[in-house]
Amino acid sequence: MIRGAPAPMAEPPPVVFCHDSPKRVLVSVIRTTPATPPCSSVGEPEPPPPLVPTSPGFSDFMVYPWRWGENAHNVTLSPGAAGGVVSAGLPVAAELPTLRGAPQSSASVAAVSGGEDEEEASSPDSGHLKDGIRRGRPRADTVRDLINEGEHSSSRIRCNICNRVFPREKSLQAHKRTHTGERPYLCDYPDCGKAFVQSGQLKTHQRLHTGEKPFVCSENGCLSRFTHANRHCPKHPYARLKREEPTDALSKHQSPDNKAAAEWLAKYWEMREQRTPTLKGKLVQKADQEQQDPLEYLQSDEEDDEKSGAQRRLQEQRERLHGALALIELANLTGAPLRQ
């Protein structure tokens, strides 16, 4: 090797990996690439021309077209926007650089940030009902908008302190406790004494004393159980949790430390059995049906499978439709500069 100044080596092209696999590369929806300004005779660069959106490329979907349906529900078509922007709600794209070192535009970042809100709003843990009424605690950045909406709303279920409106009277009463600081639901477990604003919070807390874990991972063969519905299985983070009432062997394994705790647990399980007799009746009826007439029981299972299959096919058709609409929008975007 000859000593001297080392020859400059070209840097290898950057490779973007997603989930440790080069096959699933995500790029931003719209990439604005400013043209390199030529240097003037004086030596001062000319002002850069306005940013022109280039070809959207693969947008925020996976590279393979047949996987577009997996994220088609995150597509938002905006024909009224300037230039027509197609946004996709994938927060991963905000963390990844665009290909070929091009900087991300503010439009793509805004699309990603809006997608995060949409994803959180559509998640099962957000508490949306089938009729469109929102439940649960709202996001902190939306409280001001809710207050502004309440000032102009005609609803009578209104908070007299902050003017927020609510779909039901029970929600308003629970909300008012955030102003007064009242916590009427007290845990009566020995030496606990914690108080809560809502009764559901108390029930969730008491599972720590009873050892209940009614939410299980929906992955086949996984035995992970959880106390609350908003947890995620560490082995299967993308699997949903399903509620499964534990058997006596699983639910009553908690060994009390003293006599008072033992009495509290006995009283708790007695009240629990009194509250849920109908659920046990349904489980016993299903077991009896399986033992008495197994053919009829299997037939009912087949009917359930047909219903779930029909729902799955309908969902696939909707995803294909969203994918087709996204393709049409992308074609319009790429063809607009050519027509001009």
UniProtKB/Swiss-Prot annotation:
SUPFAM superfamilies noted in UniProt: beta-beta-alpha zinc fingers
Family to which this protein belongs: Belongs to the krueppel C2H2-type zinc-finger protein family.
Lineage: Eukaryota, Metazoa, Chordata, Craniata, Vertebrata
Keywords (A to Z) from UniProt: Activator, Coiled coil, DNA-binding, Metal-binding, Nucleus, Phosphoprotein, Repeat, Transcription, Transcription regulation, Zinc, Zinc-finger
Coiled-coil ranges per UniProt: 299-332
Bridged cysteine pairs (disulfide): none
Record field: compositional bias (Basic and acidic residues): 127-140, 307-317
Official protein name in the record: Zinc finger protein 367
GO CC terms, sorted: nucleoplasm; nucleus
GO molecular function, one term: DNA binding
Pfam families, alphabetized: zf-C2H2 (PF00096), zf-C2H2_6 (PF13912)
Subcellular location as annotated: Nucleus
